[in-house]
Amino acid sequence: MIINKLNLIKNEIQLKINVSKFHPKIIAVSKTHEMNIILPLIKYGHEDFGENKAQEALLKWKQIKLDYPNVKLHMIGKIQTNKVKYVVDLFDYIHSLDSINLAEKISIEQKKKNKSLKIFIQVNIGNEIQKSGISLGQLNEFYNLCTQDLKLNIIGLMCLPPKDDNTKEYFIQMKNLAQKINVKELSMGMSNDYLDATKHGATYLRIGSKIFGNRN
């Protein structure tokens, strides 16, 4: 059932959008779901999974990642600075770098563990007070700090656009921002807007309910 849902999404992207040159990676957002629900996807060969709480993910994924070394774990939630050590231990990607303080903590922890995670800067694309993320005006300076001073491996940008009728415009804006700072990856698009996101350059889609169903 879950495998069928994943394949339906892939087929829909293939049929409705010209993605002959690239295929966006689908991150199956497995947060709050038990491993018995997730395991069929892993055994099927799906590799990318998203979690939003470091310690919960550690309990759930530590052994699985040893058993299935091809699995890539994506931190998609807000990271508390006192949880950075767990994130660096377990995860392969961070999609939610949103402050200088967090960037510094990640840099320190990576040096301790001799690791280099692939990182997205979270952009507050709608300039919303209630959301985290780097403002458009600060993005260039923040990117330079992360890459030059802290030596972080910034591969792209991530956004959570406002829930309004301008979602496509935000996706277009994100693509333009990525081109300006010369990063290739865009983490944008979820269960309700992944087709629009793909049309406008998303390379990573974060899809939860469309694969796993609604959470309890």
Q: Could you describe each region identified by the protein language model?
A:
Residues 198, 211-216:
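Expand to "…catalyze enediolate/carbanion chemistry for C-C bond making/breaking, isomerization
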